[in-house]
Amino acid sequence: MYLINDLEVTKDEFTLPVENLAVWRGDGVFEALKIHDHYPFGLEKHIDRLKQSCKKQLFDNVDFNLVKNNILKISSNHKSGYVRVLILRNESDDDFTIYSFYQPLLNLPEEFTLQSQPAPWHAGGDYEVDSKNIVGSKSTSYAYNIKQTREAVRDGFTDALLINNKGIVLE
C-alpha cells in the first residue's frame, strides 16, 4: 500500500519529483514502525518522535492525525513488516508531502557481524531534546550513516555499529 498524504496510489504513481528539496538537499524527516500482528509497535512514541523531528526541521502544520491514520491503515493490512513515513519538503520551505508505505520484513543473515565506525555527526546524548539544534531529529540526510555502513561491508562485516568519540553505541 502506498499513500501520498491521504491518497492511496499505485507503486508506479508513488514518485518523488526531482525538484523536491528532499531529493537534492535531504530535507525531510522519517519514522519506521515495526508491524506486529496488524498493529504498529510503539505508535504513540513514534508519533511523538516524529513531532519532535518536524519541530526541529521546521515542518509546520503537519497533520499528525493523518499520519497516524495512514500508519494504522497500512499496518491493518499486514501481519508483519514495517510502515515507513516520510515527510519531505517540496519546492519551497512552506510546502511538504507525507509519503507512507509498507515494507516487508528485512531478511537478516544467520550470522551478523558489526564493525565499529566513528559517527561524530551523530547525537551522542549530549544535547537537550528541546533545543533548536537538529541533532536528535530523524532526518532523511543519511549519507554519513550509509558511508560508514559501506566501509564496514567493504571490510567484510555485515553492518556498521556507529559510536561516538567516547565509544558509546549510537546506532
What are these regions (language model features)?
Residues M1-K73, D93-E171:
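Helix-start/capping segments and mature chain N-termini
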Residues S76-R89, D94:
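Ordered, amphipathic secondary-structure segments that act as subunit-interaction surfaces
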